[in-house]
Structure formats: structure tokens, C-alpha cells
């Protein structure tokens, strides 16, 4: 009993001095959870660097706002296809968010960060390096689909295989989990950003207009993954005239959006279908029983779950909070990690 009291006191003091962190550094959004303090960041993964000086001008939501207010302001994501592409920019972005945790304590926090299953050693090291430069004293990297499955409420300790598909902004990550371990994994670096980019390119080519990113996102989500060419709908949206640079209104056909999203969407669906078909027979039988769970922003695409159910013949469900499944699961993994001291083990 004395041992448990001592452990509890030590954990409590650590939460005060240096709250440990769970990090979901995504291509589109970054989410940070501080042990004992809850979610301390849920903002766009954007950073605006001052031209010439290289100084950080804005981060996260503020960088996104500046981009909307000033068409010459240019904010970028330091991630590409789900992994860190610019360590320096990623560390500056994380440092801004980690400073909120360090205001809560006086020591450098430890961190648990999530990475796609297909991230190579160099890409994992880039994530670790960016997090350390940002102020973390130690970093451990965990697979995103495991965090997503836990955050979606799956019992990952079950002896029966369960499939989770996390469709983020930069990568679609597919995994089968059994008895607390990843049995099979596969990933394709085609995801929501590719759908959005394809919509923007199609509208630019056919209408001579540059779509605002949020408008491309809205069209993508409203039209969804149904592939419906039969029923045409018209959408009034806002963009910028490519010739004059002036704001303009455009009436866009749903057929254009369907045609735009189909190629990247087909890559995603085919990757999931291949992962299902490649399962060993015993695992396949278990997944038929347990079904497929969708997480990530792509899980909210209208008609996607039905399309995947038709393609795979599996029961497909969308997690209750798909956008936050990874960070919610990472929070739970952090609690276990603190108890087992994963940074030293």
C-alpha cells in the first residue's frame, strides 16, 4: 500500500512539474494532451515564416487566420503525407504548443508521439528530433492505427482480430490488431489532402478559379464518396479569378466534384480492399466477425462507409469521434506508458 501511495505522489508531483504529453502531429491538424491538464492544443498544422528573416510569424489557428485575411500571406504545413518534411519548422510549431505545457510545469516534459505504420526509420527520427528540439526531454513513438483503435473504443487486448482504417489528411493507415499487437499493417500515402487538391485542380482547369481550401473541403465532404453521376446538384461557392485575382462566385456541378475525387478515392478503396484480401484465412474469418472501424477525417466522407461495406463485404462502422480517435487513444496509451515507464524500457 505504501508503494502505491508513493507512486501516486510521484506521479502527482510530475504532473505539476512536467506534465507528460501525448502528441498527434497530423498533416492537417495537431493535437496535444497534457497529463493531468487535458487537451491543450487542437489547431491546424500550419506555420507562417517571415520572408527574409526566417522568424516564425504565426502558428496554428493564427497562421490560418492570417492566410484568410491576406492573400499574400502564405502559411505552410511542415508535414507531408503524414510525416515530418521540415524538422526545423515542425519543431517551431511544436515548441509553440509545448510552451503551454511547460507553463504548467517547470521541467521538460516527456512525450508519446504517433506515426504512420509505413514511416521509415528516418521519418520516425525526424518526428523524434522535432519533438526534442521543441522541448521534450524524451520521446517514444507509437503506431497511429493502434492509438486510433484504442481511441475508437476497440478492445485491442481481444484475442480476436479487428481491423482499423485511419484516413487522415496525408496517409491512409490500415491495420489488423489482435491481443494488443499489430498483426498486419499497410498504408498508402493518398488521403484527404489528395481529394481536396484534386477538387481544386479540377475547378481551376474548368472554371478558371482558385478555390479557397475550406471551399474545396466543403465540396469534397458534401458530394462524398458515393460516386453518384446520376443525380446532378449545383453548388454556389467562392474563389479567386485566376486572371484578375479578384474574388468571384462560381456555380459548380456535383459531376465535376465526383470526377475529381474518384481517382484518389479509388486508390484508398483499393488499398483497403487489398489489405482485406491479403489477410490469412484464420485472421480473415475473425475480421469478418468483428468488422472494420473507420477513423480520421476521411471517415466522415458521406457514403464512404457504405462504399467500403459493398467493396469488402464487411460490417463497417465509423468511430464516434473519428477526428480525435488518434489523440484519444494516445492519451490512454500515455497513462499506461507512465505506469510502465516506457521512456526507459
Where are these regions (language model features)?
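Nucleotide/phosphate-binding catalytic cleft detector across ATP-hydrolyzing
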Residues: 1-167, 175-292, 299-345
